[in-house]
Amino acid sequence: MARTDDDNWDLTSSVGVTATIVAVGRALATKDPRGLINDPFAEPLVRAVGLDLFTKMMDGELDMSTIADVSPAVAQAMVYGNAVRTKYFDDYLLNATAGGIRQVAILASGLDSRAYRLPWPTRTVVYEIDQPKVMEFKTTTLADLGAEPSAIRRAVPIDLRADWPTALQAAGFDSAAPTAWLAEGLLIYLKPQTQDRLFDNITALSAPGSMVATEFVTGIADFSAERARTISNPFRCHGVDVDLASLVYTGPRNHVLDYLAAKGWQPEGVSLAELFRRSGLDVRAADDDTIFISGCLTDHSSISPPTAAGWR
């Protein structure tokens, strides 16, 4: 089904199911003996979503090599890709708070459990923004598990295509305080102009010393429907409602490194291969064109007030 400007989802459909797939990756990486990450909430959250394929993966009845019809080595590289991505953003947030930042905003948080699993400094406030159905599911499921946030967690149930800056501030966000922003696994699901508006609003809400992290798929402009079907079909054959070709926005868009730099940030990018190398993994398995980006805001000259106008 084609995307619309007001489409919505839960964790079993549309963009929402991709959040569940990413959580599956974190659960598998947590089980991996290398111990690159530890997300104890990924597996119970995946099980609570209730999709049979993912439950069987958690039980060890199915693995990625069988599902995607790839070699065990390629399947393992997929797990490592999730692990190093998660570790990169974990380290970014921990470094930001170690530097004194006490306000964190996680955009399109999905089944992200960092507000519960990371060792946050005292008085750190973590804002999570996502679709209302997604936020309600995660909050309720983690409460039923007896999980307690390790930070002051504030859920902001709103679509990022709506006026989320106003909703964020209504939840207590202080734009005068430095913030660590995280936009993980998000940009490919946004129109090019919506991606720009996202970073415009982040910049407008950011005090000097704020930080931002995201990832940018350099080949998204040329991402073909055939490639999308190749990725989606193994899941669809097992009853998962995902059609990547209809979810991803392709075509030319601004490179995030350039766009952030023009807005007064000092961003730096690192390749997936480099993240593999840092973790002692075979870089030949990192055949992905994703760049992981983080940076600090030092210049306010390009800032204008946040707005939802033209968000879609």
Swiss-Prot record:
Record-listed E.C. numbers: 2.1.1.-
GO-annotated molecular function: methyltransferase activity
Class of this enzyme: transferase
Record-stated family: Belongs to the UPF0677 family.
Gene Ontology CC annotation, any one: plasma membrane
Name this protein carries in UniProt: Putative S-adenosyl-L-methionine-dependent methyltransferase Rv1729c
Residues engaged in binding S-adenosyl-L-methionine: D130, D159, L160
Biological process per Gene Ontology, one example term: methylation
